[in-house]
Structure formats: structure tokens, C-alpha cells
Amino acid sequence: MPLDADQGWTESLVLTGAKVRARLEEAFGQLEPSARTDPSQPAVDYRFADGIGTVGFINPVSEPFCGDCNRLRITAEGQLRNCLFSTEEFDVRALLRNGASAAEILELLQRCVGAKKAGHGINDPKFIRPQRAMYQIGG
């Protein structure tokens, strides 16, 4: 994912979930899809054919799940993000430090959710890579 601290990510180095699944199946046998208990979960889970163990894949680049995502992230600095790949942040820390009312906090949350885009746009030539690494965002 293009959220590395050293900004060394390139699409040419992407190892898709499909390729990883194929390698696992070569080594351990067929993987069987597991039923999703939460349609908004980012991982697609599989069971090993022998019934012992599961593995989950989160493939935002090769298999985006943006349409089902209901996640918000808050950074250690109190900045709210509606997507790991977003460059826009909403300052919830300032509201809390200034004694904001519940209505003001709710309004900020609504603005944040309302600004959520339909997709992350990683494959768009105009995509702007976030400056924060994933671990700095809370992912």
C-alpha cells in the first residue's frame, strides 16, 4: 500500500492478494471463502480445506472495497480521517480542547463522513500520496 514511511512504494512492486492466495493454495491446498459476518470488514477471509486455520486478505490496491468501508481513523494528534489514503484531516483535538459541545463534535463527524470519497484513487494518475505512513494514521 502506498502508505510507507520512506515513500518507496510503487505499483510495479504490488503482490496482489490473488497471487498470494495462489501461492498458499500451491503449498497448503485449496482455500475456501468464509462467510462475511460484517459486510464492512476490509478483509476477505478464507478457510484452509482441512478446516484448520483461516487467513484474511486486505487488498485495497488490487481489490478495492471502498464502497463497503465504514471506517474512520483518528491520529495520535487528534486528526480525524475518513480514509487511510485521504490527505484531508478534520481537527477533533481542537474541538475537544476548546470544550466543544456534543452538537459541534457531531457536526465535525458528519462533515468528515460526508467528505468520504467513493474510492481511494490509488490508480488515478492525479493521486496524491498521503505524507503520513500507515502507522502514523492509526491503520
For each predicted feature, which ranges?
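Radical SAM enzyme core and accessory elements
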Residues: 63-139
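Radical SAM enzyme [4Fe-4S]-AdoMet core and its adjacent flexible, acidic
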Residues: 1-54, 60, 94
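Short capping micro-motif at the N-terminus of alpha-helices
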Residues: 55-57, 82-83
